[in-house]
Amino acid sequence: MGETLKIGDITLTAVFADHTVEAFGLIVNAENKTLYFSGDTLFNERLFEILEYKPDATFICINGRLGNMNVNEALTVAKKIGAKTNIPNHYDMFASNSEDPRLFSDNIDGGFIMEFNEEYEF
């Protein structure tokens, strides 16, 4: 973890994720913004290490199955990180492996559900 790749003005940093050996989260720095993508991960207090990156936005898995945090665990992590924008992900992928994203976005400051095939600007 902590490996960094720079591509032009974009910096990508691999961060801890509790899933498989190969799994990692991702910090993306671009245009003076810092984004955190949890990737597949179970709840683990090591996720709070993300605080040092001071992300402006989090993209956190919420489906609670197959090695991923559930909504309440995702809320705990996102609230501790304290980003201005918090976006649930990893839901509605499979009928038997989903969660209502509103359970996340309605219970955190800056909660936001992205629409499919839409572009967003931070």
Task: Cite the ranges covered by each PLM segment.
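Metallo-beta-lactamase
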Residues: 28-84, 89-95
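Core dinuclear metal-dependent hydrolase active-site scaffold
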Residues: 1-52, 66, 115-122
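Acidic-enriched, low-complexity/disordered segments with a strong bias for Aspartate over Glutamate
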Residues: 9, 18, 40, 56, ...
